[in-house]
Regions:
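Ferredoxin-reductase
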Residues: 23-105
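Iron-sulfur-associated redox domains of electron-transfer enzymes in respiratory
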Residues: 102, 116-117
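Generic structural signal for buried aliphatic residues
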Residues: 61, 109-112
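Methionine residue identity
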Residues: 1, 20-22
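A generic "binding-loop/recognition-motif" signal
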Residues: 96, 115-116
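Short, surface-exposed secondary-structure boundary micro-motifs
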Residues: 66, 114-115
Length: 117
């Protein structure tokens, strides 16, 4: 679902749960790459072309691992507009980042909102 927001502090586009690709097919935010950097820090690359297209340095996303999870903000560590991916790096410090760390390549993130900031 796509919601338009017109407030000055908010982005023009706000993505909820999934997005519609060019063929009108609903698509979730799939983890295309996962790399454990050390025992408590993980890098993930997420398939999110609409967010990658608009991302700028210094922005962040808000994600929710599953429908019952809490929303957490994470800095955009990088993006590839051509591949349509967004990279995040996070430290495992609580229940939500622990749950996120248990996801593997091919799994999907429930909500992935941004870019913000």
């Amino acid at each position: 679902m796509l919601i338009l927001i017109r407030q000055s502090y908010a982005p023009k586009l706000f993505f909820v749960n999934s997005y519609m690709n060019m063929k009108g097919i609903e698509k979730m935010y799939k983890i295309v790459k996962k790399k454990v950097l050390n025992p408590t820090v993980t890098l993930m690359e997420i398939d999110a072309p609409l967010i990658a297209k608009k991302a700028e340095p210094g922005q962040f996303i808000i994600l929710r691992v599953d429908e019952n999870g809490e929303r957490i903000p994470l800095t955009v560590a990088g993006y590839d507009r051509e591949a349509g991916t967004v990279r995040i790096i996070f430290q495992i410090v609580g229940a939500t980042t622990e749950k996120l760390n248990h996801l593997e390549e091919g799994d999907c993130i429930h909500d992935f909102v941004g870019p913000l900031g």
